[in-house]
Each structure stands twice: as C-alpha cells, then as structure tokens.
C-alpha cells in the first residue's frame, strides 16, 4: 500500500513559514480515487508556494518523500507543495518543468505519479540541461494511453519509443527508469521486467526533473538511487558528489579532495562501507573527524595496479601507518572496508581478510564525526554504516556465538564452500546472496552482497563449488581455478517465478562475482514447452563431487521430489533421476536438498545421504527436516536403503531449516548448518534491526545402530576455542530432588556437558536442566525414563506469543547406553541446541528469555540420578572478543515508563561475575 503524506507545513515565497496541524493521507497502490481528498487538496493549494520562471522554489522539501533537491521552475505554470506531494500545473497547452540541482550519470530514477487532468502529460526528466529541453523524458500520456521514452529535443531519428498502458486520471502509477551508459530501461508499476529496453547516446549526464504539459499532475516518492546506510544528514561537503547506480559517487580532482562529513558523532565505533575505486585513485572512510573534515582519521584504500593498499592517515594527509601487504582488486571490485576504533586501538580490515590490514594505537582523536572521502579520481560508496560500539551486537536477543546478520535478515544458507584457506558463507537476504568469510567457521567477516538481483530476476537459494582444475573453462585467466555459484533464478513477473538454475563465478577468491554471459542459465525450468517458459517448482540447486564416477552431481527440489543431474564440466547437465513422490510425502513442499557421501564408522561401507527440508504443514507441526540414506548408481540414480514412509529426522526441534553442508572441505569432514526458523513464523521473531540466525556448524557422521545406519551430529571442534571453564564436577555424585548442582552460576551464552546414569533401583523418573532461569522463566532440557524420551520444554522460556503456531514441547526417543544418557547443550541469548548420546538425537530451538534470566539449575524428580560428569563452559562473544570481561548488572528491561504512583518489579542478574558468575559480584 502506497502512502502519500500530507504535512500541513507550507513555505510561502517570502519564506514565511505557516505551521498547521499534521495530517496523513493514504492512497492505494493503484486505482485510488482522488475525489475524497479534493477539498483538502483545494485548501492546501490555496496556501501552497509558487515559483517564478527560472527561480528556486521556496518550498518545504521535507513534505515530499524525495532525495532529489533544489527545484527550479521553468516554462509556463506553477509548482506547489501540497499535502499529497509536489504538484506541477501548466498553463493551457503549455509546458512547465521543475528542474532540480541533482545531477547524475547512471541511476535509477522513479516516482509515484497522479495525473489529475485527463488531457495532461506527466514526465520524469533525466540527464537534462538547466532548461529541461536537452534531456530524456519518461512520459505518462493519458490521452494517448501510453508511456513514452523520448528525447526532449524531438525531430527525425531521435529516441521516441511508446508502450500501451491502461491509465486514468486520479489514479497513482509508479514510473521508473534505469539509465546505465547508453542503455535505458523503463519499468511500469511494480513489474520486474522493463517494458522498454533500448539504447540512446545523445545524453550521458545531467539534471533530474519533472514536467507537465497541458494540465496538472502530482509527484511523490521522487527518488534516485543513492548510498544506503545509516548516515545522518551531512554537516559539511566539498568536492563533487552525486547519486549513482553504484551508490554515492565522489570525485576528487585538481588536488581538491571530495569530502562529505555526516552528523553521526561517536567515540568508540564500528564503521564500515563498500567502495569501488576507479583505476589508481584513493578513497576511504573518515572517522573521529571535526565537522569540516580537516581533523581526524581516514582509512584509505589506494589503488596499485591490480592491487590495493590500506593506509591510516590523519585528515590532513599525514600517513600514520600502511598495510604490510596489498590486496587483490579487479576492475569494478567492490571493496569492503571495516574500521574498529575502540579506545586507543584502531583496526582496519579490508574485504574480510585476516589479520587486520592495520592494527595500531593512536590517541590523537578520541571522538568525532564520520564521513566519506575521495582524494584522487572517482570512487563510489555504498552501504555505509556507523555503529556505536556499545550497540554493536548487544541488542536484546542478539546471539553471542551464532552467526547473525548485523542488519537485514539471514535465512537459507547458500553456497557454503571452502577455498584457499577460507570458509565462505552466503545466505538469503531479500532474494540476494549476502556473504561472509571465516578462517575457523566461528569468527566471520562481512562482505558486500555477492549476488544481487539481475536481469533474470531475484537470486534465490543455491550452492557453490570450487573448480580447482578449470573443468568449466571459466578460469583460464585466473590461475586455472575459482568458485562457481549455482542459484535459483526467480522472476516475479512470471508464473511461479519461472524458476531455473543460473550461474555466477568468481576469479578472485570470492570477492567479486560475475553473472555468466555465456551460460546465464545452465538448466531451464522443466515445465518449459514452446513459448511457455515453465512455472514448475524447481529450485535450490546443490552440487557435490562424485569422485568414484569422475563427475559432479546436482540435486534440485521439485516440490514433491528431488531431481538429480550429472555433469563432467560444471556447465552442461543431464537429468538422471527423480526421487520422491507418493508415499514419501508426509508434510510440506520439499526444499533445499543436500547430497553427500560419508563413511560408516567402524566399517568399510560408504553411503550417500540425501537431506531435505519440508515447508510448513500441520502434519509436521510446521516445517521439518529429514534425510535418506542409500546409494548413488553409476547412472546417477539415488537408491534409498529404507522403504518410502520411513522417516529419518535430521532434527527434533522446530527451528532447523534449509540445512546445507560445506563443499570442498580440506580435511574430509562434512560440516553443515541451517537457518533457525520455522515456516509457520519465518520472520516473526521479536528482534529489532535484524532477523534470523544460523545454527552452530555441526560435523555429520554415519554410525551403525540397532535401527540401522543413522546420522549423528556433533558441534564442530573449533567451538572449543570460545570456552572458559565455569564448573567441573571433580567426581561422580548423586543428584537428588531439591539439590541444585549449578546454584549461583549465571550466564547467557554457555555450554553444558553432562553424563548421567540411572541406577538399577530408585531411579529418577525425570531429570535435566533448567536453563535461562529468572522471574518464572526457564527452558527445560531433560529426560523422562518412562518411554525413554529426551525433550525440550520452552513453554516458560520467555516471549512465546509472537505466533499462535509456536510449539513449546518437543520430544524424541533416546535409549540409554549402559544406563547412561549423555547431554551436550549449547545455550545462547536466543537459542538452545541439544545433542543427546553423541548426537544421535538433536534439538534446535529458539527461545526469547529476558536478558536478566541467566540462571541455571540441575533437577531430578521421583528418585535419584548419578552425575558421572558435569562441566559448564562460558562461551566467548565472537563479535566482541576483545572487550574486557568486567562484571556487569544485566536488567530485564532497558527502558520503563511509569505513571505517578505505579510500581513494577525489576529483575537483574550478574554477568561476568567472580567465579565466572558463580560467586556474585
């Protein structure tokens, strides 16, 4: 639903401001009537500002949702700010133009347009001169029933392309044009595909503007592509800056630096941004600066051939330090620059490489403003974010050692691959592939979006592999090796997205990704026939190497089955099997398949594992995860060891979806992780500023059991580096009802390892752990002897009412081994993961306790249990590992408003207390 806001604050031409009460008017996205608002518009028009020919309009631009500024009127007519937007009204049979001061070369320019007179034309002007006539025009002509892309100069042989549309006065329509070089693309409404796609070279740069002929039109939400981020308004600017498709374009020339300083003022800060250097120029991020940008620090990238070097400079150009090494840089590489300025320590990271390019101590500038700068040549800035360190990964429910995005969302993990010493993690974020890298699977560094939307559509889930022998032929100029990503192309304009498998590749260790021009689509939708491109479910490709048959195998979800393909060159794929259908279907749609081969421990057998996730369905209490064990034939067919209907659950909790394993692991391990959500409530969790977290990475193995070969999962060994000991039970002891072996220990992120034995007589009927306890809150992880059931009960875990479908009790059968049960429990600020009997049974659940609910206890009911061993480890924060672990009081709420005489109990606990929380503060 579009909303046009009427702010009754109008500026007169004499700069006298008339203030009135605020109001808001909301229109539908299309076919909305203007009649009900006519009286208000008339009232507003009577007080609206008008501009004379060629003069700047004294208008309140804040009343318009626009980042295009500095409007001047040309032609015959008037320009007004109304409660619904910017109104242009021409004299009869005349032209009127509003030309802005905003200049752009390559961009997306768009607006919502309402033509109020049936005979009028309304236009977006772009790449215009000052008078508006040396320009391109994107025109909505109601009388002719067309949208028209034309060169304003007219005449024979110049640009003039039309498309028929249905439009009428008083309705709102969205116009959008993308200009990149000589290519011009026009979009109508919310369509993904352009209705006009043409070439024109007459105008390559210029101003943005608006135009109306023979009547009146309203313009609102007038936007041009620009830098994303959380920067506040600039307080100073020098040099040339303009919006661009790539973000904010800065040009430093003739010895004059381009600088833009924003109002964000911080001392300890994490500052990050993406930038593109043009050739051998230099550009960077200003931090702890004065308002003019003449004092403070600058983290600078300097081009050196096909490399870049990092410098820490003072704002006056004095070099404080330079990186010992240089980093790869291709033409149009989008470099990610991250500055951590904490106290006297300054660290600068580039493109996720570790260690830091610069790590030093300096005391010259303890705090200040932040900004961007280009000191020579052209640079483009995008996604610039300034985060006070006190707020960095400290929000309510923010995980401490699980991967979660700093902002935006994380859903399906994609493209997990190891290559040249780094683990690459991609994940879905709004139909794009977000990207992070790690050297240990624990500590992650963010990189720019790897695979954004493209001409084919959105970029949904998929996988990546390392082509180390140049089997694809894509890496002849990059040392004969590189990375290939296979993704689901989804076009919103076509039936069911016309899902097909696209290809992208990287020749620089995953930092820069290119959509293949020679092989943009490697497998078309299987429903394609004749002119019909196909609308079948066909998504989530996962590619794995099959060494025994010297080939690669791809599995793709088909909704109620999995399609298998094989290839010897990673480009040409042959369908070999369709597995599933019928009795295999027990719940929702099949998605996100994975396929890999593992040895069976203690034998010479090797088996193939096919994993899937299933969408939300009442039969499975929402979404679910399961796997099949079998063989892969030389013909490329998967043969299941078990009959259809035999369900092998990957996870017994309710938040483990779209699991994927890493490709090309150097040590033979099979490691996987998943998105911790459920499709009954995928984005409903009560977090602010970010959505979604991933499970801890887990090593997968196959073992013989009394039921047959089954998959086991254990936390990866790398997690041990985060541990600090809290409690170790030196000898076995009996746990009885009423005794708490964990009394006084508090933590929000920790690990419990326990081995518990049921005696032959007098055994407890139930035992386990109460986790994240406080003020009546707790999550139970326990075992019931009757029925041999391990369980997680989160009914009192904290916030649970964000969805009616959020289930609270999860159980799994687990028989004791030698009368013993092993539990390994990993607790974080908003999750609990439980591994029973060395990972034979696994639970993954999210929880949302109050921050102060940090207690823990051991309990037993109806008898006794022998505590053979018990260890508790605090787990270090992976994003703030360098901060001092000083004791602090954690409250259950940060802000509270009370009426006079009202009272409310507050709860608190100690974090990082003496004895790791066991001894108080």
Swiss-Prot record:
Reaction equation(s) it catalyzes: Random hydrolysis of (2->6)-beta-D-fructofuranosidic linkages in (2->6)-beta-D-fructans (levans) containing more than 3 fructose units
Gene Ontology biological process terms, A to Z: sucrose catabolic process
Gene3D superfamilies according to UniProt: Exo-inulinase, domain 1 (2.60.120.560), Glycosyl hydrolase domain, family 43 (2.115.10.20)
Signal peptide: 1-23
Entry keyword annotation includes Signal: yes
Keywords assigned by UniProt, alphabetized: Carbohydrate metabolism, Glycosidase, Hydrolase, Secreted, Signal
EC main group: hydrolase
EC number: 3.2.1.65
Record carries keyword Cell division: no
Predominant cellular place of this UniProt entry's protein: secreted
Residues annotated as the enzyme's active site: 412
GO molecular function term, any single one: sucrose alpha-glucosidase activity
pH influence on activity: Optimum pH is about 5.5 at 50 degrees Celsius and shows an apparent shift towards higher pH values at higher temperatures.
Record localization: Secreted
GO annotation, cellular component aspect: cytoplasm; extracellular region
Regulation of its activity: Is completely inhibited by low concentrations of heavy metal ions, while Ca(2+) and Mg(2+) or chelating agents such as EDTA neither inhibit nor activate the enzyme to any significant extent.
SUPFAM superfamilies: Arabinanase/levansucrase/invertase (SSF75005), Concanavalin A-like lectins/glucanases (SSF49899)
PANTHER family noted in UniProt: EXOINULINASE INUD (AFU_ORTHOLOGUE AFUA_5G00480)
Family: Belongs to the glycosyl hydrolase 32 family.
Job of this protein: Catalyzes the hydrolysis of levan with endo-type specificity. The products of levan hydrolysis are a mixture of fructose and a series of fructooligosaccharides up to 12-mer, with levantriose being the major oligosaccharide obtained. Is not active towards sucrose.
The protein's name: Levanase
Protein source organism: Bacillus sp. (strain L7)
Taxonomy of the source species: Bacteria, Bacillati, Bacillota, Bacilli, Bacillales
